[in-house]
Amino acid sequence: MGLSDGEWTLVLNAWGKVEADVAGHGQEVLIRLFTGHPETLEKFDKFKHLKTGAEMKASEDLKKHGNTVLTALGGILKKKGHHEAEVKHLAESHANKHKIPVKYLEFISDAIIHVLHAKHPSDFGADAQGAMSKALELFRNDMAAQYKVLGFQG
């Protein structure tokens, strides 16, 4: 399920919008994730106390973590599917240390697409959304494959 060159161009053009404010986009993605799927918040001891969108918006730690998440994802997307080393490292930490189920990766993927569309509607139309969805699915499938190698049933 690879992406065409044209699809990768759409993905990376959209990601260029994220890179103008990685921390801000990351914070919004995490807020969307945590408010839409409150069970995901339980995996983050540092953020469990944040109960409302306003509290999350005011959290510098959440903003920093959003920056970390989207910086890592951006590095993976820029590999255009040739991200084995990056995914292996990420899967090891997410399986062994953080215990993040694959389903949560699907939730955050949906949050990313929602935030990009909300913030950049004219630059993130149906074609770009479809391409990003495919790129994130490729990432999730590769994470799931690594989880299996690691014996993590997430």
Swiss-Prot record:
Record-linked InterPro entries: Globin, Globin-like_sf, Myoglobin
Sites bearing Phosphothreonine, chain numbering: 68
A GO BP entry: removal of superoxide radicals
Enzyme Commission number: 1.7.-.-, 1.11.1.-
PROSITE patterns: GLOBIN
Record's keyword terms, sorted: Cytoplasm, Heme, Iron, Metal-binding, Muscle protein, Oxidoreductase, Oxygen transport, Phosphoprotein, Transport
Binding positions (heme b): 94
Residues the record lists as binding nitrite: 65
Primary localisation category: cytoplasm
Record SUPFAM superfamilies: Globin-like
Cellular component annotations (GO), alphabetically ordered: extracellular exosome; sarcoplasm
Residue intervals of the Globin domain: 2-148
GO molecular function: heme binding; metal ion binding; nitrite reductase activity; oxygen binding; oxygen carrier activity; peroxidase activity
The protein's enzyme class: oxidoreductase
Modified residues (Phosphoserine): 4
Catalysed reactions, semicolon-separated: Fe(III)-heme b-[protein] + nitric oxide + H2O = Fe(II)-heme b-[protein] + nitrite + 2 H(+); H2O2 + AH2 = A + 2 H2O
Positions annotated to bind O2: 65
Compartments where located: Cytoplasm, Sarcoplasm
Subunit structure: Monomeric.
Similarity field: Belongs to the globin family.
Its biological purpose: Monomeric heme protein which primary function is to store oxygen and facilitate its diffusion within muscle tissues. Reversibly binds oxygen through a pentacoordinated heme iron and enables its timely and efficient release as needed during periods of heightened demand. Depending on the oxidative conditions of tissues and cells, and in addition to its ability to bind oxygen, it also has a nitrite reductase activity whereby it regulates the production of bioactive nitric oxide.
Protein name: Myoglobin
Naturally occurring in which organism (per UniProt): Capra hircus (Goat)
Organism taxonomic ancestry: Eukaryota, Metazoa, Chordata, Craniata, Vertebrata
Gene: MB
